[in-house]
Amino acid sequence: MSLKIVFAGTPQFAVPTLRALIDSSHRVLAVYTQPDRPSGRGQKIMESPVKEIARQNEIPIIQPFSLRDEVEQEKLIAMNADVMVVVAYGLILPKKALNAFRLGCVNVHASLLPRWRGAAPIQRAILAGDRETGISIMQMNEGLDTGDVLAKSACVISSEDTAADLHDRLSLIGADLLLESLAKLEKGDIKLEKQDEASATYASKIQKQEALIDWRKSAVEIARQVRAFNPTPIAFTYFEGQPMRIWRATVVDEKTDFEPGVLVDADKKGISIAAGSGILRLHQLQLPGKRVCSAGDFINAHGDKLIPGKTVFG
């Protein structure tokens, strides 16, 4: 079985699926990805990770600013592909595009739908304290992640998983599950599952201000925040008026009478801060213009300011 496929994706999450399709018996006719944009401190124009893979494999690359344009839609239809595979593309597909393929448009989504529809399912799952997430392969419709589900594969969320950890695991699971689903879809050997609207939750886009730590929250909630916002936008607090990023932190199973934000202790185990309930121990930190450092190195550099019983952060 060899399907003619149009692939649409942009970030690193989409790369394993594109690679899997390239290495399979299927034919990738073209790759749609978002236009090159300025990125980083120097605002250098960068191509997407998906574009890089397509270029390396000499696959035609198409980068429209929108697919609402009639000319772009006709171009898509003219490819006469069997199916469109969409993985974190970032552009809305109009009805004409959704109906342009014999087997429809199939999406790889990083949650167990209908939980966490939307832009940030990985981060929202960690923030909510979910114990599992996964991949859903979905037949796209005009709604936001509301289409019928072709397949699901669950993945445990450990107490130490960051968004980066889950991102990498789920991207690989998604690639494998997509190939399995395409084979069944072509044979007609697949049962579509309607989503339960009553169980739907929405994973709104992460805003930078969400990364600011409120020490009145519980240590458990703040630890989730640190994990969910690694590698971006990185949870942060303030130290001597400067934003201080926290890359790694753990919950200490102890009680304290200190007020939220007060330093409990600072030693080789880490820097322990009282939260609304419980204690959060900081292990990896970063001040502006500096490299990420261990708590031990931070103590060596700023130990004179780390006085137990004082409000040092926040």
Swiss-Prot record:
Asked if the keyword Protein biosynthesis belongs to this entry, the reply reads: yes
The record's catalysed reaction(s) read: L-methionyl-tRNA(fMet) + (6R)-10-formyltetrahydrofolate = N-formyl-L-methionyl-tRNA(fMet) + (6S)-5,6,7,8-tetrahydrofolate + H(+)
Keyword Protein biosynthesis annotated: yes
Species name? Coxiella burnetii (strain RSA 493 / Nine Mile phase I)
Q: Which UniProt keywords apply?
A: Protein biosynthesis, Transferase
CDD domains, per this entry? FMT_core_Met-tRNA-FMT_N, Met_tRNA_FMT_C
What range does the record give for the signal peptide? Answer: none
Could you say which protein family the record assigns here?
Belongs to the Fmt family.
- Taxonomic lineage: Bacteria, Pseudomonadati, Pseudomonadota, Gammaproteobacteria, Legionellales
Write down what this protein is called.
Methionyl-tRNA formyltransferase
User: What's a BP term from Gene Ontology annotated to this protein?
Assistant: conversion of methionyl-tRNA to N-formyl-methionyl-tRNA
HAMAP family, per database record: Formyl_trans
GO cellular component term, pick one? cytosol
Please state what class of enzyme this protein is.
transferase
Q: What is its EC number?
A: 2.1.2.9
Name any one GO molecular function: methionyl-tRNA formyltransferase activity
Residues the record lists as binding (6S)-5,6,7,8-tetrahydrofolate: S111, L112, L113, P114
Physiological role: Attaches a formyl group to the free amino group of methionyl-tRNA(fMet). The formyl group appears to play a dual role in the initiator identity of N-formylmethionyl-tRNA by promoting its recognition by IF2 and preventing the misappropriation of this tRNA by the elongation apparatus.
